[in-house]
């Protein structure tokens, strides 16, 4: 049966949060639930996820995010540059997170984001083999990469591969309120805005840090301007995912 997808509305915003930072559960999720917003939380066991449970989620908290209706996505076991990994290493990293999710009763992740935004055709081929629906990258090459945040292109499903969805705005010290407004305004005429956050706050990685009060200002703006705020997997309501294209 052919799935009938909805027209892409203006002000369609995708929220993503990388690395499994503790604030995902303690601050971000309750605020998003208040407004009925969805989001994707991309989980890795790299960085200090396994060692520092004051700053990173426990797997029980990850399960809690899933039970609250949010999407849990795959961000690899080791958080390595996927372009430096062999095919076998990348597959092992992906399978590890899949199995950790399954062990906790979390649905098998359907979407992926590239650690450090790095991507290459070989990695895309692996994601395709693993049947991911969508994958999120960074701002480059359309916009210059800045490790403290910045602007990127809106996601245009007629132009961008579903396993190479760009980041329209990446939060960090280099990303201002004006940049946020600009990113939201790109969500029109069939384009979708994809926002990338890390910790709110991110004490381990200040170059991707977002102040809680600043984040609340962003979320209030999305609510006040009647934005539709979704997880990456929810794009399937509007956009043909990779597996459907392949089939």
Model-derived features: positions:
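Short, glycine/acidic-enriched loop or turn micro-motifs at the edges of active sites
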Residues: 21-22, 78
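Histidine-anchored nucleotide/phosphate-binding helix
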Residues: 25-32
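C-terminal domain-boundary segment and adjacent tail
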Residues: 1-7, 39-40, 49, 102, ...
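Non-membrane alpha-helical structural segments and their capping/turn regions in soluble enzymes
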Residues: 87-92, 177, 209-212, 216
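Metal-dependent polysaccharide deacetylase catalytic core of the NodB/CE4 family, i.e.
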Residues: 13, 33-133, 138-151, 157-166, ...
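A Trp-anchored, charged/polar loop motif used as the substrate-binding/catalytic surface
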Residues: 21, 171-185
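Gly/Pro-rich active-site loop or hairpin
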Residues: 56, 166-171, 206-209, 213
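DG-centered beta-turn motif at the end of beta-strands
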Residues: 15-20
């Amino acid at each position: 049966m052919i799935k009938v997808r909805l027209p892409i509305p203006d002000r369609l915003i995708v929220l993503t949060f990388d690395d499994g930072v503790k604030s995902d559960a303690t601050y971000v999720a309750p605020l998003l639930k208040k407004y009925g917003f969805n989001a994707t939380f991309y989980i890795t066991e790299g960085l200090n996820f396994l060692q520092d449970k004051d700053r990173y989620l426990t797997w029980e908290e990850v399960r809690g995010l899933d039970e609250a209706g949010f999407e849990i996505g795959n961000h690899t076991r080791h958080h390595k540059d996927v372009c430096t990994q062999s095919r076998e290493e990348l597959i092992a990293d992906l399978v590890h997170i899949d199995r950790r999710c399954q062990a906790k009763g979390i649905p098998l992740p359907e979407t992926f984001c590239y650690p450090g935004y790095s991507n290459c055709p070989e990695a895309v081929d692996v994601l395709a083999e693993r049947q991911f629906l969508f994958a999120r990258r960074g701002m480059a090459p359309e916009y210059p990469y800045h490790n403290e945040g910045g602007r990127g292109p809106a996601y245009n499903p007629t132009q961008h591969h579903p396993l190479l969805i760009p980041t329209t705005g990446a939060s960090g010290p280099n990303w201002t309120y004006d940049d946020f407004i600009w990113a939201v305004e790109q969500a029109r005429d069939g384009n979708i805005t994809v926002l990338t956050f890390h910790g709110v706050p991110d004490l381990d990685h200040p170059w991707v840090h977002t102040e809680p009060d600043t984040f609340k200002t962003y979320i209030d703006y999305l609510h006040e301007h009647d934005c539709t705020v979704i997880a990456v997997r929810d794009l399937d309501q509007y956009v043909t995912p990779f597996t459907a294209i392949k089939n």
